[in-house]
């Protein structure tokens, strides 16, 4: 049995509620309000897993005929996932407000707490119709002034302010990765009971790797440091790296990052010259910050090439950034090429 894996006997599994009640990420019990919020999010993801699995059988595939705040075509499941998550957490007394990739403005919640929830309800939704793994990404912040009315600026905190982050990937299994700032753990959904059960209690990313993920069709548009790194990987043993690499690309960030957390590697979605005024494609608050929190807590690194993602100060709720994350030795090399 590999280190960090839980024995397969059903009597030894720990469910999500039991885990939250027992963990002490800062030497003290996890606040009840944070437990309640995370349980509400995860219970909703359990329901969403069922909806995703039914797909065409209940008429949920295909475009919805609407667009989101980003100007992107919404899939039917995008809207359903967004509505499910909002409904699922509205009753949390510890929640002050939420923000979604699918909505222009944050939504106040009639709770008395000081937690803020940000989420991408269904990452990779362009892959729904071809049955590729998709997922939900979430991040939790603390409101700096609990007594003040909710404002968009309350959410504009760097990734270092996250108190929890995770994703749920809907694939052959429904699996969740979670960090509370003290390492990364993984759970798998028991679809009979609806419970998420702990399967790995210490997820780590190897410092070295021979695997990278990037959309190679855009190579001609990349900046020189990224092109140099990828060209060296492609050269393999005959080039400067003196080892062969494999390339992977799913076009679903949640699936690509899940692979990095599971077996190491590098995921890259860099700036390109087609839209030079935009620093990147992926959303800092809903996708990149929570994934970077997970990657750092697993021993990896996440950067935009020059700065660590977690240190970036956001200026817009829907801000986009470039990102390169994963195994430390490779990301350090990419950062060096940018210097």
From Swiss-Prot:
Protein name (Swiss-Prot/TrEMBL): Fructose-1,6-bisphosphatase class 1
GO molecular function: fructose 1,6-bisphosphate 1-phosphatase activity; magnesium ion binding
Stored Pfam families: FBPase, FBPase_C
Keywords: Carbohydrate metabolism, Cytoplasm, Hydrolase, Magnesium, Metal-binding
Subunit structure of this chain's protein: Homotetramer.
Gene designation: fbp
Record organism: Polynucleobacter necessarius subsp. necessarius (strain STIR1)
GO CC, alphabetical: cytosol
Catalysed reactions listed for this entry: beta-D-fructose 1,6-bisphosphate + H2O = beta-D-fructose 6-phosphate + phosphate
């Amino acid at each position: 049995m590999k280190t960090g894996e839980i024995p397969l006997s059903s009597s030894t599994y720990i469910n999500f509620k039991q885990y939250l009640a027992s963990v002490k990420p800062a030497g003290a019990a996890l606040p009840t309000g944070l437990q309640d919020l995370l349980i509400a999010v995860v219970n909703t993801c359990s329901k969403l897993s069922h909806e995703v699995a039914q797909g065409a059988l209940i008429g949920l595939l295909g475009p919805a005929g609407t667009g989101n705040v980003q100007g992107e075509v919404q899939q039917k499941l995008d809207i359903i996932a967004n509505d499910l998550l909002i409904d699922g957490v509205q009753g949390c007394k510890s929640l002050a407000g939420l923000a979604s990739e699918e909505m222009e403005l944050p939504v106040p919640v009639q709770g008395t707490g000081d937690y803020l929830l940000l989420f991408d309800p269904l990452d990779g939704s362009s892959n729904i119709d071809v049955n590729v793994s998709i997922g939900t990404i979430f991040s939790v912040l603390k409101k700096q002034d609990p007594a003040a009315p909710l404002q968009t600026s309350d959410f504009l905190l760097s990734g270092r302010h996250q108190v929890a982050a995770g994703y749920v990937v809907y694939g052959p299994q429904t699996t969740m990765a979670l960090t509370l700032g003290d390492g990364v753990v993984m759970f798998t959904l028991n679809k009979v009971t609806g419970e998420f059960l702990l399967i790995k209690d210490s997820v780590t990313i190897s410092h070295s790797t021979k695997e990278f993920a990037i959309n190679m069709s855009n190579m001609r548009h990349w900046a020189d440091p990224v092109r140099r790194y990828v060209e060296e990987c492609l050269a393999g043993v005959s080039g400067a790296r003196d080892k062969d690499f494999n390339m992977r690309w799913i076009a679903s960030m949640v699936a690509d990052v899940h692979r990095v957390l599971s077996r190491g590697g590098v995921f890259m979605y860099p700036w390109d010259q087609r839209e030079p005024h935009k620093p990147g494609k992926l959303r800092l608050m809903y996708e990149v910050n929570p994934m970077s929190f997970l990657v750092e807590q697993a021993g990896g690194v996440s950067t935009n090439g020059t700065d660590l993602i977690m240190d970036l100060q956001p200026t817009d709720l829907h801000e986009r950034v470039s990102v390169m994350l994963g195994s430390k030795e490779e990301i350090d090399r990419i950062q060096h090429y940018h210097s």
